[in-house]
């Protein structure tokens, strides 16, 4: 854990040039390691994403446990409230409306997208990341030092960090190590 006290209030402002395009999804379950398959599915329906800078395709999130139940490691069960999000420059946001009602083939699963909504980014003092790719198997302290250094170089002042679970991300010809 990385911890630094700060009693100063910093006023932050959001950059309104980036937005989230958010879709409700109709899909009962999806592979736990679906990130690359999801990217490929979006690329197939919307090849222009290769040309868009500052674009992020977020993986789909499902609960890990609840009411005594724990999620299997291979699949994520999705609720009716599950959303799929593409973070994009505002000038490209309306382009993604072409994905309305499309069915994405994500690995062996099919995921139907609803009509999207555009959501502005909000200012927050908490940054949560489901997956940070790690170049080598750093111990937690080394990993947090590297993350702190990277964020500082981008002008992000970090006061507290907590490392989560390590997981594998499979892409063609390679397996990456990620940490939350």
Predicted regions and their residues:
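RNA-interacting cores
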Residues: 1-180
């Amino acid at each position: 854990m990385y911890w630094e006290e700060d009693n100063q209030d910093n006023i932050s402002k959001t950059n309104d040039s980036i937005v989230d395009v958010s879709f409700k999804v109709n899909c009962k379950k999806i592979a736990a390691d679906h990130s690359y398959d999801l990217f490929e599915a979006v690329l197939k329906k919307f090849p222009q994403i290769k040309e868009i800078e500052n674009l992020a395709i977020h993986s789909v999130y499902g609960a890990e446990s609840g009411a005594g139940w724990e999620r299997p490691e291979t699949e994520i069960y999705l609720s009716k409230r599950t959303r799929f999000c593409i973070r994009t420059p505002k000038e490209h946001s309306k382009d993604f409306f072409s994905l309305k009602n499309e069915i994405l083939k994500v690995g062996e699963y099919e995921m139907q997208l609803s009509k999207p909504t555009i959501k502005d980014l909000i200012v927050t003092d908490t940054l949560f990341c489901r997956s940070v790719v790690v170049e080598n198997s750093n111990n937690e302290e080394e990993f947090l030092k590297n993350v702190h250094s990277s964020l500082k170089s981008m002008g992000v002042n970090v006061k507290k960090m907590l490392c989560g679970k390590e997981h594998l991300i499979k892409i063609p010809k390679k397996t990456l190590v990620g940490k939350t």
